[in-house]
Amino acid sequence: MEPIHNPPPQTCSYSRSSTTYTSFKDASCDTKVIRIIIALFLIVISCGLILCAYTFRDLLDADYLAQEGPQQATKLLQQLDDVLTGPPLPIWDNEHLFQFSCLMQNKHKRVLPIDICNPLTKFNFLECICNCLMTKQSVNVNETDMCELFCPPTCTPENYRRLLCTSSVFPFVMWHDPSADTQEAMLTKMDQTMSSGRVGNSHWVLVIVDIEYRCVTFFDSLCDYVASPQQMREQLEGLAVSLGAIYPKEGGADSDQEELLSPFQVRIGSTVKVQSPGEFTCGAWCCQFLAWYLENPDFDLEEKVPKNPSERRALLADFISTTEQAMSRYSSLSWPTTD
């Protein structure tokens, strides 16, 4: 028998020329143009995705109603324009808040600088504010000994006592991170934020207690980041009652006791967002609000702040540039003296 010769199995093969790749240097002119166009297209898409992620939290916060479609579209376009206009504004943190409050004390005299060594949060701010005002009251009537007086590390007890006696406007800043649900968690988050050097979700808000005006004013540049305006008002009304008892109205012997112990007024400084999306300007806005308040406690924020995002940004940028140099004299964090 003759051996059977089976044909070799057929295999599928592809032309090598169809998978040949050339470097950009050796490619033809048409190929180079196509590759450049593709690269530019991918860059544009990547930038768009980054921008979307950058303002994603603000997009989630927007109220989308069918009947308000055009208004919402205009609002988002304004936010986009605000983010893309000019270089980012500087971030003002606790040391800047202290320096600016010292600048205001030097100008107005009745302002107590902000104690940044005693961090306030939504969990302890009511107690801390009451303690500070009670300390002032006891100092005024000479009930507090120098040894018992708690004062910031960068201020002497004698100087702090004098500042307390001459102050009637007390600004307090509150630090907030929405991910912390207890005081311990908030302080831990604060330490982590300071160590990382990143802002994250942290935010500054301002509380002003004015003894002469008998008013408590709350300001949040994002309007409702810590709590809704109504929720904050309810908390501050409890503080206002306590302050009314600490600092009763002046009256004669025949004055009604209930009237003398009437609560302080409560004001919510902003019911609209003045801080632009994508910017970390809460600290600077707190300082700007304090400056306006000291000029006129009855001022209307919405009359001061432009509705146009670009104009609003320009206003804050001008405020920052005109005050940073003057603030630098307090860069050592030493408290101003009353001498």
UniProtKB/Swiss-Prot annotation:
It comes from the Bacteria. The keyword Heme does not apply. The keyword Nucleotidyltransferase does not apply. Gene3D superfamilies: Adenoviral Proteinase, Chain A (3.40.395.10). It is found in: Secreted; Host cell; Membrane. Its EC number is 3.4.22.-. It holds the Pfam family Peptidase_C48. It is a single-pass membrane protein. GO terms for biological process: protein deneddylation; protein deubiquitination; proteolysis. InterPro entries: Papain-like_cys_pep_sf, Peptidase_C48_C. The chain crosses the membrane at residues 36-56. Belongs to the peptidase C48 family. This is Deubiquitinase and deneddylase Dub2. It comes from Chlamydia trachomatis serovar L2b (strain UCH-1/proctitis).
